[in-house]
Amino acid sequence: MQARGQVLITAAELAGMIQAGDPVSILDVRWRLDEPDGHAAYLQGHLPGAVFVSLEDELSDHTIAGRGRHPLPSGASLQATVRRCGIRHDVPVVVYDDWNRAGSARAWWVLTAAGIANVRILDGGLPAWRSAGGSIETGQVSPQLGNVTVLHDDLYAGQRLTLTAQQAGAGGVTLLDARVPERFRGDVEPVDAVAGHIPGAINVPSGSVLADDGTFLGNGALNALLSDHGIDHGGRVGVYCGSGVSAAVIVAALAVIGQDAELFPGSWSEWSSDPTRPVGRGTA
């Protein structure tokens, strides 16, 4: 299977699995910056058999201080979550959302960092499923308890590459900022106390790797995007955003074309919390 097929699944492919009766665990990870709790929307309509996962409460650990707005969960707490969701050994997992692939990319990153195999993002999310004529169910889904084992208790040192704040600021890595340009420039900052970016970072908004319909760009377009920003394919790349959510979209997009990338989980919310760290503003 090519890299793209290891990261993404199309609505047609998923529908085929469901119709064939093939086992699959589907996680609904709806999350928006302005509406972080997607549970009500989930209850109103979701993919058949999908289980809701809270990005805020289950894919983050807010008891951790000093690591940004969405610290990574512990392996133990994540194992309880994925077993609640019915995830089993050797059963594929599909994650989806309805906005900008942020929720599903975060789930994909967290689950794969934990050592869970065969996790894919529904390309285009819920809109793609609806456009393909996929059926929708309502209400809560409570599956049989799963048995999957999380292999890493510390996801900061799990199976996906990460950056610390010190590493993000030390150079030696091409650092990408996945936030919208106005936040990168420091024109506005709707969430964190300080506006701006990590000096030396390149602004590659998470939305720039998606087509108008919310699917990931084709491999050729993704490679061209790297070239346009002067990013060497195969070189060391780090990615951050506000708090380690939308940056996962860029990490996933790079994985689609076989490029590893290191996520800075604390991102700008961690970096900017220390007044001794430098702040870049403007386009450079």
Curated annotation (Swiss-Prot):
EC number: 2.8.1.1
PROSITE patterns the UniProt entry points to: RHODANESE_1 (PS00380), RHODANESE_2 (PS00683), RHODANESE_3 (PS50206)
Glycosyltransferase is among the record's keywords: no
SMART domains according to UniProt: RHOD (SM00450)
Pfam families documented for this protein: Rhodanese
Keyword Repeat belongs to the record: yes
Keywords linked to the UniProt accession: Repeat, Transferase
Catalytic activity: thiosulfate + hydrogen cyanide = thiocyanate + sulfite + 2 H(+)
Name of this chain's protein: Putative thiosulfate sulfurtransferase SseB
Catalytic site: C241 (cysteine persulfide intermediate)
CDD domains documented for this protein: TST_Repeat_1 (cd01448), TST_Repeat_2 (cd01449)
Additional comment: Was identified as a high-confidence drug target.
Rhodanese domain span: 20-138, 169-280
Comment block on domains: Contains two rhodanese domains with different primary structures but with near identical secondary structure conformations suggesting a common evolutionary origin. Only the C-terminal rhodanese domain contains the catalytic cysteine residue.
